[in-house]
Amino acid sequence: MEKNCNSVAGHAGTLVKASSRQADDKAGSRVPPGGHLLQTNKTESQLLPCASPSDPVHWTNEIVPVVADTSAPAEAAPDQTVSDGEQLTRAPDETYYQRSESLAEPPAENELPAGRSRRRRSRWCLGCGCFEQVKTVVLRMLMTGFEKYAGVVYDHPWLFIMVSLLATAGMSVGIFLRTPESDVYTLYSLSGSPSQVTKEHLLDVLPPDRLLFVLLTGTSNLVTRETVTRIDSLLQGIESITLRRDSVTTDEFNHRLVSHDRSPFPETITFQDICAKDGSGKCQVQSILDLYPSSSAWGVMPIASASWPVVTNPVTHKVSRLDAILGKITTSVRLAEQGSGRPALTVVEEAEAMLMRIDLRGETIWKPYTAAFEKLVLDYVLGQDFGPDISVTAKAERSSYDELKRVSTLDVVEWLRLCAAVLVVFLYTSVVNSSKTHRTKLVPSAMGALASLLGYLGGAGLVYLCGVRHTTPAEATPFLAIGIGVDDLFVIINAYSLTYLHPNPKERVVDAIRDAGLSITITTLTNVITFIIGALSPYYSISMFCIITAGALTWGYVLCLTFFLAGLSLDARREARKEPLSYSLFWRFMPRCCRKSSYEPQLSPPLPLTAAASGLEEMRNESEEIVTADQTPPTHGGDLLTTYQLAALMVLYKKHTCQSRSSQPARRLFDRRDGTGTEETMSTPVPEDSERDRTNQKSCGTQVSTGIVDVRETGQDAASQRRLSSHIRDMTTQESIMLLKNFEKEMEQNPEKLLKLYHPEPLGNPGRGSRRFFRDYYGRFLGNTFVKATVLVIFAAVTALAIYGATTLKFGLSLKNITPQASYLRDFYSLHEDLFPSYGDEVTVFFAENDRWEDREVQMRYLQMVKELSEQEWAVVVTDGMSLFLQHAMPSLHSGNRKEFLALLKTWLEGDPIGQNFSTFFKFSFDNLIVWQFRYWMPHRDNTTTLYYWLKEGKDIVSAGKPYFHGEVHTALAVIWESDPKILPFTLTNLSIALVCILAISLLLIPDLTSAIIVVLVVSLVDLWLFGFMALIDLPLSMISMVNLLISIGYSVDFTIHVAHTFTHCVGASRKDRMVETMIVMGAPVTHGMLSTLLSILALAGSPKYILEVFFKMMFMVIVFAYTAGMVLLPVVLTLLGPFHPHGKRESGKAIACDSSAQLIDMEPLHGTGKEEHGVGV
């Protein structure tokens, strides 16, 4: 291939030999449209378009020389830009060559050029050689597909915009038709868990009652006649509530009743129909009224207990516990009176809280009507006004469902938060991608932010239309979709900004998508795979959330490649016409008579030759020729320089500039004549120390401003600029080809030669300032030895702190926490825990097996089990009718006589005043005991893991009675507690699967094993930090925080993959240089993606919803930790341990860039004008 290029170059030199003398008089050269410019001041030579040194040359068209008019006067290039203190000069072109119609194919292994050794198979994988070949083919196919697709979108932008908007509008209907799932046990329990099986068994044999509580609290004593009277009035109001049977059409979860037979129920359902009855046939209502024998004693007769806290009503014989009815009690003790026989009494003096408990029917067939009746009772109770000194709150079985349903719906505040997030992201993307020139990307940025929002509406809407129910965690989906979606916007605009060297707008868009399409596909795929793995979670709420979010991200990706890409195409046309944005958006559509001014693109006057030759910064001018937006784009040839080589040149130029400034005295350049020459005078030399200080403070860190500048501070810049311009003029075609072929070897041996290839980046190009910042400041800062040591020490301390925190991590999800802060239910939970600490969760122990209770040994074993259970600190109150019966009747019972046992038991439950309190605990058939139960209460605890282990201990005690009896233990929240000990294994398993899957995909970008291992370690560190700091901020590990840990994998891999992949392909002479090059290429997109996501997540700050609060805290830590790991820790580690192959062993030439790549100079003729289009850049 080298011979081919050399022969063609020699032929081109012969063709233009006649015009060489005229070229010597010109300060610069105009770039020929068919190739890449590199020329000499002796011979006007043309660098032909050719593939990289590793590719063969395939000429599809003959070379047609076009000789320019040599008599034309010298003029500056129409497109002159200045960056980093350089000035590029051009002269009219001499020849033009057509480029190949297709990408050059790589040579076969046996057709490698002379001197090129075959690529050795990697040591760590025997099949890596084959894998690399397959990967190369697949990547080329994907990039070619993106290239062709982008061309279609560019040709039909309005079609793609309208189709995408119409499709999104149709899909977004599902947002408004979604069905929320509010069953807390369905949302946050494990399907098929042991507790779930026990619950279903209990519902079949002995359905528990539905409990309704009314809690009154005051600032003073409530045990007064007035308060008791008002409680009686409240109870009478509840008993007077009625419910129309036909008005009930849905259940408590808002699911429509299908095939429901209403005939067994009365048309008007009253409280007597809906309440659960006790042994005497009365409704089971427990209140302070049960403590008085009659209404005349209300608030007058003292409430006293001989065996605290149990008290028995002397008239009704109803047994009550005072500490379960009254809260914040003040008592006094009355000593026993020997003469009257009155025992010692504990008397209630004051109580500041009262609790009323109402039992409602729990049968499955009655549930729809019971739930509807509960809603009426809640509305009535919460609407009562007891005055300023008494507050009322309540809790029903359906309360948690109602409140979860309320928080599962986007209210006005949430819509405002969402709009604020969209607005903030829109403003941020617009600011960072805007400039004062025609290159501003304000409109594409706005369309990109809008595309991320439309992605949520369309993707989530389609998922809802498919039958997926909306869950509470899905409230965070729109914020995540917006934050993650705009990342693709920054990557594409960054790739587009690096294609400014193309004269044709269509080619710019095509090349940007060809280079960035694979990158955004990989990152989107990693995020979607993360959520797909989360969708396999056994938790219903998390599974639905992951499905909804995956759909939103997928559709956002589609809109990015349709809606946003079409907008970028339209804006690229405008940029090619050099139209100001205001003209395109506003003045163009006004009548000519009303226009502010007629816009006619004007060419800027050419620069004087002397200014171009001297390279003075103050003579900077940005003038370009107008390009027809719809002209036929040129076909693609091989890239001469990849993005990584361009970044290496930027670093090399900066080092060269700093060295030249510190080693040479200042020069004053001033044109004393008529613009045809310059005169240089030497100023007083600057001391080395002061010059070095000025270099560190200004020259090596800041951009030289335009305009008239102090030559005492910029004279050295002019010298280096003039020297670089001279290098460019003196470079021959043969030398340029050899430099490009041996780029990496020259980087190691003769780096100053490569400065001849360095070209400036135009002003106003999006991301230009960010790239300069990461090169001049951030990269140099991280490369400092002291800074690297400090970073490692800080992250070691953070890791140690995280390890400590991980050892104190708590688990579980409290029902109180997922309740909205402004909810009456949350107030009830808080007050009940404070005023009634011993009465937390009610536990039911039931026996549904046909055990031999008539046997004496079984009875003794049972009494022993109850005694052991009662002695536990977590079994505060044990209410057991069977124990009381056995203590009462055991002396008269004969072992083994079942008929006698059942008869005495029935008699005790029906006739004994004490036994009547337990009659509803037993269920008989005609001649047998079917099932019976007893209850105990556990104290309140915030740690649900502790409650789970208490329940487990209770199960173990009951299970120890086998084979004498078979009992089962159940409490309502057990199905949620049971997930606590399993949440950590589930989390670690999902994290491992996600990490393996994502790294498998990432190997497409990082073939180096060392880099892959570093990525694994860094991502693992991020997860470790999250585990530790969750404990430090008192955030338990639950199913909600678990999904954030999965998200952290995606974020961490995105950041680290971008950095590690770029570092692997950089070509700097040292690890430090490659780290700086990595920051130049990926620093801005990664940083902007992080900040946009962070801004969208900030909209969740201060949300009253616990789940959104958890998402905000977790996502904030995820973003901060992932970014600092990828942009601070990883670059430092790579400078120490990163892959560093000697240039002689690396494959020179073109490297397939999966993120972004740019051509150094890429030209094509301007059809119909006879002029050429020029571009330079980095």
Swiss-Prot record:
InterPro entries: Patched_domain-protein (IPR051697), PTHD_SSD (IPR003392), SSD (IPR000731)
Signal peptide: none
SUPFAM superfamilies, per database record: Multidrug efflux transporter AcrB transmembrane domain
GO cellular component: membrane
Annotated SSD domain residues: 414-570
Coiled coil, from the record: none
Catalyzed reactions: cholesterol(in) = cholesterol(out)
Deletion consequences: Gene knockout results in higher growth rates. Accumulation of numerous lipid bodies in the cytoplasm. Accumulation of several species of cholesteryl esters, with the greatest increase in cholesteryl linoleate, arachidonate, C20:3 and some very-long-chain polyunsaturated fatty acids. Accumulation of several species of very-long-chain fatty acid sphingolipids. Shift to the endopolygeny replication mode with the generation of more than two daughters from one mother cell. Unusual cell cycle with a long S phase and short G1 phase.
Keyword set, alphabetical order: Glycoprotein, Lipid transport, Membrane, Transmembrane, Transmembrane helix, Transport
Localization: Inner membrane complex
Positions annotated with a glycan in the UniProt record: 41, 433, 621, 917, 943
TM spans (from-to): 157-177, 412-432, 448-468, 478-498, 516-536, 545-565, 789-809, 986-1006, 1013-1033, 1037-1057, 1080-1100, 1114-1134
Task of the protein: Likely facilitates the efflux of cholesterol and gangliosides from membranes. Plays a role in the regulation of lipid homeostasis.
Family: Belongs to the patched family.
Protein name: Niemann-Pick type C1-related protein
Organism of provenance: Toxoplasma gondii (strain ATCC 50611 / Me49)
Gene: NCR1
